[in-house]
Amino acid sequence: MASSAPSSSSCTFQAESSFGPAVASCRRAFDFTLYFEEVVFVLVPSCVFILLAATRLLFILRRARRFTTATAATTTSTDTSSSHSCGNAAQNQHTPIGHGLAHHHILQQCTAGLLVTLHVAGLILLCTTVPSRQRTDLSVPASVVAALAFGVVPVLAHFEHKRRRPSSGPRSSSLLVGLFLCVAVLLRAPLVRTHAALYGSGSALVAVEIASLVLQLVLIAVGEVSSWAADATSNFSPEESAGFLGRSFGSWLWGTFVTGYRTTLSLDSLVPIDSSLESRIVATSFDHILPVSPSGKPGKNGQYRLLLALFRSLGLYALAPVIPRLCLAGFTLAQPFLASATINYIGNGPAPDRDGYGLIGATFLIYTGIAVSTGWYWSLSYKNVTKIRGGLVDGVSQKMLRLSQQHGTESKVLTMMINDVYRITSTLAYAHELWVAPIETAIGTWMLCRHVGPPGLVVLGIIGVCLGASTYVGKHMAIQQGVWLAAVERRIGATKKMLASIKAIKMMGAGPSVAEALERLRRLEFAASRKFRALIVGTLLSSYSTATLAPVLVFGTYIGATTAAADFSASTLFTSLIWISLLASPLIQLLQIIPSFGAALGSLERIDAFFEKQEFTDERDEATAVDSSCSEKGEKKKEHVSLSIHNSSFSYTDDSEDSILKDVNLVINRGQHVVVTGPAGCGKSLLLQAILGEVAPQNSGSRVCVDGKVAFCSQTPWLENLSARQVVSRFSRDKDPSWTDRVVDACELREFLEAQDPDATIGSQGSALARAIQSRPDILLLDDVLSPIDYVTKKRILRQLFGKSGILHETGTTVFQVTQDHAVAQLADIVLRLDETGALRPYQFPPSQADVEDENGDVDNGAENTRPRESSHTTEAQSGPPEPKSKPTEITDRKVYATYFESIGFLNLVLFIGGGIIFAFCLKFPNVWVGWWTADSSDPDEASHNIGYWFGIYAMLNVLPLIAVAGWVAQLMMLIVPLSGSKLHRKLVDTVSKATFSFISRVDTGSLLNRFNQDLMFVDSRLPLDLFNTAAALLTGIAQVILIGVSAVYVLASIPVLAAVLFLLQHFYLRTSKQLRHLDLQSKAELHTRLSESYQGLATIRAARWQRQVHAEFQAGLDRSQAPVYLLWTVQTWLKLVLNLVVAGLALVVMGAAVGLHQHGSSSGASASASGIGIAFLNLTTLGETMTNLLTAWTSLETTLGAIARMVSFSRDTPAERDVLVRPDSLDHGGGGGGDRAEPPESWPESGGIKLEGVWATYDDDDESDENTDDSGGRPATDVAADGEKHEATTITTTSSTMTTTRYALQDISLEVRPGERVAVCGRTGSGKSTLLLALLGLVAVRRGRISIDGRDVAGVPRARLRGAVHVIPQDPFISVASGNGETIREALDPAGKLGDEEVTDVLQDCGVLDKIVGAGGLAASVSDEALSLSAGERQLFVLARLICRAGGRCRHGGGGILLLDEATSSLDVNTDGKTAEVLRKWLPNMTVLSVLHRLEAALKYDRVVVLEGGRVAHVVTPSESTVSSDIFAFFGRSRSFLESRETGGVSWLE
């Protein structure tokens, strides 16, 4: 290169050797120097790429070694959740790379190699054909570094292809390679242009460089089509196989969009998402968010421990959004410079055409850069928060499995999983705005000061005040959010109780009172959230303060501080306003985020406090660790001890001073069968909990030891939402089908399994028992699991399980069970009894109760021979046909919006819309005023008004938006939110409470609870803000487009095109986004169900050590949930990208038209004004953000409205009970009295007579449908086999268009119960006993026949009136849902206050629960479960006492009535059960009683015994008849001598 020359030679080649950056115009117009291009366009990107590529290669090699080690370890383990793979589990499979990818990789390597060859050739040509005087000092070094950089490309691509993690998908080209190639093409093109100008366009060097550019484009295209070559490996994520451009412009989402547009998406049809989001990978990264040693105290890092742990878990991925966010900040801050240059270009007269073309090019680069960098920023941010969501939800599930079962834990877990995790993730998505906002503020303020001087610093004061206010609000918001969520937890807990007890509630007619209790809790919830909502109003008000007040204060200070005439030219005013707008627009969002961060920190504190909870500790493990034997030290080991308890006392709570079980000593040898009995509330279940380790001993020196694998079956069976087949075998690792068959047969499940629909989700107690035995335990713990089963079935199960030839005896299983059943006790090796003092003593049942045949079961066999085994097609727990496979009703957007607007009221809707219009007008009209101001001030000599006039009105106009937004948001948050939330909650409660019993009993409880939890959370917290943001952005955007069109008239021509593009975009986008949001809600409902089910079965899961498998299955469900969550976020990111590209197109139209008019306007007479361009750019700078905010808020609004759509769909799809079964005027009584047509009197039923005439009942929902009948008198035809056995209670009715199959649970039942009579209803499981009670209450469909009470057909009585008139004690006792809302025990027992305190106390004393009530605090104590702590038997006694208190006054004074008992004393011992009959006779002497039971001793106390079989009446006998068939006694397993012994014993069993 030539040596130094004087400055006069700037037009020689020496000018190319300077850094420039611009070269002298005498050499080339509008170009950079060669030296600058070699440094910035070649050396810098090449060196950065080489450095990053080396780092990436090192990472790949290290990861490959780790993966090889992990794979070797994994292949030796067993996949515990293979049978439960779902959703995106396919992405976990290591599918080999197909031939298409192999060929693609070869093509890529060949192309890259050829590209390297061309760069080497170019280097040689540069050195040989270009003289040194025409090269800079960096020409050759830059070419060498560039050749090295391109030489790294095939190496990196090869290792990305060969050394990647197999589950990460087919990456034939890395993002780093794609990014480098794209940048290289953009930067090398100007250098090739410069070389062509310097060395000639026909030179060999330029030809090689052009070929190199073309080959780079080819290589980019090859990398982008890698996903097409991966069709054979469709299990991989298309995102991971996409190239850089595909990721930048979201082309990998096209498959999802097309599928969603053409068909219906499902969780199984979604494309696999990024493998880094798999739960197993996320759980590994986030494993340290759980404290290592929970102590129940806050961690050492305080409230930020969990937040820091989350970011530490993300590692370097937490910093991934930094680079695109900095790029976005740079492009955004370039807009004022572009606007200023454009205004000056328009206002300064003629200019070279190249300046206009440069402005057009700059517009393209700036706005396209904003679009692409925005897409990358949000894509990486959403990926991080998706990982955080997975880590938190997984952590909550893990922690739940480690905690003891305590009241309120379940509702707390469900609230955290939905509400808290949502708040955290939706807030942390904006985490990077916190650090970038100060940078943008500093730069923006500095640039503002360059235009207006020191007055520009005023904006910092406004920002400081607003930030201080937001920080203050954020701190208080976390506190108020905790108060609100505590109220939510109380409501969710009460709702869970309601849903779990829906059968009992409907039977008791307690629906209205329960609904009112839930409504009361809902009102308390809104009262608790009032301050939180007020803080939101303050937050939104402060967020808009910067945008409205900053221009006023800045310009006011500028006017006051300027001594000379202030410069109010269009360039100064609009450039300043653009800077203020760029400062204020992100601050509006930031100031809303800061309080949200306060709320998110509150949620993090709640979850962290949950993580810090003291975990369940198994004291048995410590004992076993000391001594592997369960024998006492020093004791001679004659037999192997399986279970032992030494000197231990137990209570349900650690802080209880009095022990329920005292000084328990127990030693059980292997293979023994031990039975424990005792009165209700004595602590039998507590003893089982102690053996399981769920309850720790209270005294020192105690020892609990369990030696062997344990299985536990609780009194309330733990049944998941699975079929009976899946329940039995889901935890079994035993692949021996013969063992499964033996277990199924022993538990009498064969016929049930064969008859059940494979897809039905109906389990049974027998399924839970079979699951426990299927796991081959060494010790089997049973908590009264056989009490609901009829005696005949029970005898078979006992013989096949516990008899000498039973499978448990064969396997040597130690059995420890709690029961009140003497039939079970007779097969036990040891019988123990717990008394009221908590002492455990040996026990022997009285002879009258132990008079049972031997295990060969003579009477049982007789019963089995005389009575064929009924088909199990109709079961006692029949809940109708399987849940419908059809999709929910499609709800249109119009219906959804109509439902929501109806909930807020017409007046509120009009006020809300009006407030939004006023706000948008007040917010944007000041821009128009500034345009008039600048136009008037352009010539000071001709100004019509002074500055004070213009500025004063401008100041007033900028204050009006604050007033408007304050009233607008206050109306929304303080009036609309509680009003709509209350109405929608009531709609949900009414839908559930009024649903038909057959429908609501088969709907998944978790799905229902999710509607009361997540859906209402959306309605309360997310929907109002989304509605506000959508309305504000929509109205503001309309105002901005109008201002752009008015200010630049030529832009109006593009408005129709813009509208068409937006319409097509939303039409195409919304079809997919709507489905994704529904799948998001659906998958969260599944997680809801999984967590709820797992919590209910914690004791069972921990007993059998199933935690790992349950957690693995939960992770599979979490993967299903992560897919729609992440895809919904990614399609929203794609929408932001496209909208910013639309804004880029609009900006190009504005700029192109302005440049064109400026260049050619003088000849045509048209021109663009500086003030018009200023207004246009002032709105263009924020239009992209406004449109992004609009579509983001709109899509979020669509998501939240999806919750309302689910409510509407649920309401439509849920069949509701008719108030009256048939119209009273259409009743055909066949001679019945006409009194049925009138409303029954308040005293009805007065006597309590019941009559059933030819009743056919079914669980089918269509109870009002007419049905064709046969020729046999209108009764449905019944299949009868040749031997006379009714194999199926089924009738098939054929019409001209359809064929329906109806399964009848009751068939031709005719029975009359006289007033005051007490009738026992007995029968095998599935015989129709409970169905008979349900038919009396109108809970099942009576298709034929008539049921009357006191001569009145119940078909004409409103159902609520019917259930309110009949007293019911259900099998599952229901006390109250409204725990914690102030209801006392006195109010729960006698809400009407009919009895005095002494009478209530007497009732409690007679029912045997007075001591428990006194211990809870007396009649004035809360009725909550945690306060009462009643056992299952005590709950039944409490319900009995409540019934007596509510009905006793009337019955004791001569009134009658009807009492239905559905296994109401199944959890009581025989003695207590006998006392309940005496209590009923004492307090309800005139009551007609119809009782479903299984015990003969109880049945013999009734006036008559009705035996049902196969839905028909088999026997109706009175115990006093000497001609009673022995069949009735055979049913109970008693011989005829039993009756004789009772009679000869001088005992009047009728008493």
From Swiss-Prot:
<feature type="binding site">
    <location>
        <begin position="678"/>
        <end position="685"/>
    </location>
    <ligand>
        <name>ATP</name>
    </ligand>
</feature>
<comment type="function">
    <text>ABC-type transporter; part of the gene cluster that mediates the biosynthesis of the phomopsins, a group of hexapeptide mycotoxins which infects lupins and causes lupinosis disease in livestock.</text>
</comment>
<keyword id="KW-1133">Transmembrane helix</keyword>
<feature type="transmembrane region" description="Helical">
    <location>
        <begin position="139"/>
        <end position="159"/>
    </location>
</feature>
<feature type="transmembrane region" description="Helical">
    <location>
        <begin position="358"/>
        <end position="378"/>
    </location>
</feature>
<feature type="transmembrane region" description="Helical">
    <location>
        <begin position="452"/>
        <end position="472"/>
    </location>
</feature>
<feature type="transmembrane region" description="Helical">
    <location>
        <begin position="577"/>
        <end position="597"/>
    </location>
</feature>
<feature type="compositionally biased region" description="Acidic residues">
    <location>
        <begin position="1259"/>
        <end position="1270"/>
    </location>
</feature>
<dbReference type="InterPro" id="IPR017871">
    <property type="entry name" value="ABC_transporter-like_CS"/>
</dbReference>
<dbReference type="Pfam" id="PF00664">
    <property type="entry name" value="ABC_membrane"/>
</dbReference>
<feature type="domain" description="ABC transporter 2">
    <location>
        <begin position="1287"/>
        <end position="1535"/>
    </location>
</feature>
<feature type="compositionally biased region" description="Basic and acidic residues">
    <location>
        <begin position="1219"/>
        <end position="1228"/>
    </location>
</feature>
<feature type="transmembrane region" description="Helical">
    <location>
        <begin position="535"/>
        <end position="555"/>
    </location>
</feature>
<protein>
    <recommendedName>
        <fullName>ABC-type transporter phomO</fullName>
    </recommendedName>
</protein>
<dbReference type="InterPro" id="IPR044746">
    <property type="entry name" value="ABCC_6TM_D1"/>
</dbReference>
<keyword id="KW-0325">Glycoprotein</keyword>
<dbReference type="GO" id="GO:0016020">
    <property type="term" value="C:membrane"/>
</dbReference>
<feature type="domain" description="ABC transporter 1">
    <location>
        <begin position="645"/>
        <end position="861"/>
    </location>
</feature>
<feature type="glycosylation site" description="N-linked (GlcNAc...) asparagine">
    <location>
        <position position="1179"/>
    </location>
</feature>
<feature type="region of interest" description="Disordered">
    <location>
        <begin position="843"/>
        <end position="889"/>
    </location>
</feature>
<feature type="transmembrane region" description="Helical">
    <location>
        <begin position="172"/>
        <end position="192"/>
    </location>
</feature>
<feature type="transmembrane region" description="Helical">
    <location>
        <begin position="903"/>
        <end position="923"/>
    </location>
</feature>
<dbReference type="InterPro" id="IPR003439">
    <property type="entry name" value="ABC_transporter-like_ATP-bd"/>
</dbReference>
<comment type="similarity">
    <text>Belongs to the ABC transporter superfamily. ABCC family. Conjugate transporter (TC 3.A.1.208) subfamily.</text>
</comment>
<keyword id="KW-0812">Transmembrane</keyword>
<feature type="transmembrane region" description="Helical">
    <location>
        <begin position="959"/>
        <end position="979"/>
    </location>
</feature>
<keyword id="KW-0843">Virulence</keyword>
<feature type="transmembrane region" description="Helical">
    <location>
        <begin position="314"/>
        <end position="334"/>
    </location>
</feature>
<feature type="region of interest" description="Disordered">
    <location>
        <begin position="1219"/>
        <end position="1296"/>
    </location>
</feature>
<keyword id="KW-0472">Membrane</keyword>
<feature type="transmembrane region" description="Helical">
    <location>
        <begin position="1027"/>
        <end position="1044"/>
    </location>
</feature>
<keyword id="KW-0547">Nucleotide-binding</keyword>
<feature type="glycosylation site" description="N-linked (GlcNAc...) asparagine">
    <location>
        <position position="647"/>
    </location>
</feature>
<feature type="domain" description="ABC transmembrane type-1 2">
    <location>
        <begin position="910"/>
        <end position="1199"/>
    </location>
</feature>
<feature type="glycosylation site" description="N-linked (GlcNAc...) asparagine">
    <location>
        <position position="384"/>
    </location>
</feature>
<keyword id="KW-0067">ATP-binding</keyword>
<keyword id="KW-0813">Transport</keyword>
<dbReference type="InterPro" id="IPR011527">
    <property type="entry name" value="ABC1_TM_dom"/>
</dbReference>
<feature type="transmembrane region" description="Helical">
    <location>
        <begin position="34"/>
        <end position="54"/>
    </location>
</feature>
<dbReference type="Pfam" id="PF00005">
    <property type="entry name" value="ABC_tran"/>
</dbReference>
<feature type="transmembrane region" description="Helical">
    <location>
        <begin position="202"/>
        <end position="222"/>
    </location>
</feature>
<dbReference type="InterPro" id="IPR044726">
    <property type="entry name" value="ABCC_6TM_D2"/>
</dbReference>
